[in-house]
Amino acid sequence: MALSREEIASRYSKALFAYAQDAKKLDEVHEDMNVLLQVAKENPDMLRLLSDPIIRKNQKEEFLSSFSGEFSSETKNFLEFLLEYGRFNALTEIIKAFDALYDEDKNIASGTAVSAINLDEDELNRISQAYAKKYGFKKLILTNEVDSSILGGIILKVGDRIIDGSIRTRLQQIREQLIENR
């Protein structure tokens, strides 16, 4: 039975994570994977070329070495491994799964700050630092989503937590209390 891309990503990312951790190169490999993901996004033909069964292996190896020169030996070995087993078609999923393992290991969380207006970088940083400290994260990476219907305040979505500090919700709570107290 063939493995799904998610299963492939899970297995290969765990293998890469363990390999990098054992070599004490986890941060370096993580950096390499982020660079590789960016290169793949900017050059979608790269993954098609490395996944194409018609293109000879030695041509793929030459192409791979043309952009992997700055990577750690662990990353290069892993990329050669993917090439050998024909798994480059799942590279982006593997990197995302590896990233999740890395973030979990380093106690890094990511989430969304929903606000009525666009937040600048300083505001996002202050919010993420306060939330990270309060909930025990080493680091929290927030993106901003604008939703004018919340009227004001902020709704934080981090993992399975939602902290609703919006004016809209507060007004609804006041309304419900007024109705109850009639």
From Swiss-Prot:
Pfam families attached to this UniProt entry: OSCP
Keyword terms of this UniProt record: ATP synthesis, Cell membrane, CF(1), Hydrogen ion transport, Ion transport, Membrane, Transport
Keyword Transport assigned: yes
Gene3D superfamilies recorded: N-terminal domain of the delta subunit of the F1F0-ATP synthase (1.10.520.20)
InterPro entries assigned: ATP_synth_OSCP/delta_N_sf (IPR026015), ATPase_OSCP/d_CS (IPR020781), ATPase_OSCP/dsu (IPR000711)
NCBIfam families to which the protein is assigned, alphabetical: ATP_synt_delta (TIGR01145), PRK05758.2-2 (NF004402), PRK05758.2-4 (NF004403)
Listed name of the protein: ATP synthase subunit delta
Lineage: Bacteria, Bacillati, Bacillota, Bacilli, Lactobacillales
